[in-house]
Amino acid sequence: MSNSNIHPTSIIAEGAKLGKNVKVGPYCIIGPEVILHDNVELKSHVVIEGITEIGESTVIYPFASIGQPPQILKYNNERSNTIIGSNNIIREYVTVQAGSQGGGMITRIGNNNLFMVGVHIGHDCKIGNNVVFANYVSLAGHIEVEDYVIIGGLSAVHQYARIGKHSMIGGLSPVGADVIPFGLASGKRAVLEGLNLVGMNRKGFDKAESLNALKIVQEIFLGEGNFADRIKQAQEKYKNNTIVMQIIDFLEHGSNRSFCSFEKTMSLRGELQSNLTKQPN
C-alpha cells in the first residue's frame, strides 16, 4: 500500500495489517492486532484497537471508537474480538466494543449496514446484514439483530434481547423484550403494534400473505388459551404462510427474555393497519 494514503499525523502500530487502497485520514490510531481489508477508509480521528477486523470498503467517520474493551466490571483483560464485515458505513461517534468471556469473546457485525451518529453497540452483540440504526441507538450486551432491521433514533435495547429480521422499531422506544421478525414496535416501553407492512411491501413480500400474517400474529398474541398452544395451532394451521412460519420459528427458539407483545389497546391499531392496507390504490 502506498504511504500517500496514510496521513502523517496518524499512528499505525507495528503489526497492524492494511489491505490495498486503505485510506487513513488525520489523527487516527490503529492498534497492533487490527486488520483493515481492501478499500477501507478512516476519515479522521478514528480509534481502532484490540483484535479487530474491518471488512472491505467499510467507511468509518470521525471520532468513532472500534474494538475497545467491554464496559463490564468483571472484564479482566481477556483477549476478545471485534469483527465487522464489508461495505458498512459507520458514522461519527459510533462505539463498537469487543466481546467478553460471557458471550463467546466476540462482537460481530455483518455487511452493508448503516450506523448513524452516536450509535453504541455493546459487547458480544451479533448484528446481521442490511440493518439501519438511526442516531444514538444504543444496544446493551449480547443482543442479536437479524437482517434488514431498522431501529429509530434514540432507541435502546435491553441486554440479551433478539430483534427479528425485517422488523422496525420506532424512535425513542426502549425495547425490553424480543421483537418478532417483521414486527413493528414502538412506545415509551416498546410494544408490538403490528407488522412492518410498508417495509415488507418494499422488499417484495406478497401483500395478501403479509396481511394474512398480521391477522395470524394477532391470533397468536391476543387469542384465548395457552400461548404455547396457540403457537402450535398456528404452526399446524398456517404452514403454507412462509412469513408466519418464520415468526413461529423465532418464537419457538426464544431467549430468556419475554416477547414484545400487543397491549390490548394497541390491537386496535393493528386492526386499523390491516383495514387501511385493504383500501383500493
From Swiss-Prot:
Entry's Gene Ontology molecular function annotations: acyl-[acyl-carrier-protein]-UDP-N-acetylglucosamine O-acyltransferase activity
Pathway: Glycolipid biosynthesis; lipid IV(A) biosynthesis; lipid IV(A) from (3R)-3-hydroxytetradecanoyl-[acyl-carrier-protein] and UDP-N-acetyl-alpha-D-glucosamine: step 1/6
GO cellular-component term (any): membrane
Domain of life: Bacteria
Keyword set, alphabetical order: Acyltransferase, Cytoplasm, Lipid A biosynthesis, Lipid biosynthesis, Lipid metabolism, Repeat, Transferase
Any Gene Ontology biological process: lipid A biosynthetic process
CDD domains: LbH_UDP-GlcNAc_AT
Record Pfam families: Acetyltransf_11, Hexapep
Localization annotation: Cytoplasm
Enzyme Commission numbers on file: 2.3.1.129
InterPro entries associated with the record: Acetyltransf_C, Acetyltransf_C_sf, Hexapep, Hexapep_transf_CS, Lipid_A_LpxA, Trimer_LpxA-like_sf
Reaction(s) the record says it catalyses: a (3R)-hydroxyacyl-[ACP] + UDP-N-acetyl-alpha-D-glucosamine = a UDP-3-O-[(3R)-3-hydroxyacyl]-N-acetyl-alpha-D-glucosamine + holo-[ACP]
Family, as annotated: Belongs to the transferase hexapeptide repeat family. LpxA subfamily.
Family annotation (PANTHER family): ACYL-[ACYL-CARRIER-PROTEIN]--UDP-N-ACETYLGLUCOSAMINE O-ACYLTRANSFERASE, ACYL-[ACYL-CARRIER-PROTEIN]--UDP-N-ACETYLGLUCOSAMINE O-ACYLTRANSFERASE, MITOCHONDRIAL-RELATED
General function of this protein: Involved in the biosynthesis of lipid A, a phosphorylated glycolipid that anchors the lipopolysaccharide to the outer membrane of the cell.
Subunit text: Homotrimer.
The protein's name: Acyl-[acyl-carrier-protein]--UDP-N-acetylglucosamine O-acyltransferase
Gene giving rise to this polypeptide: lpxA
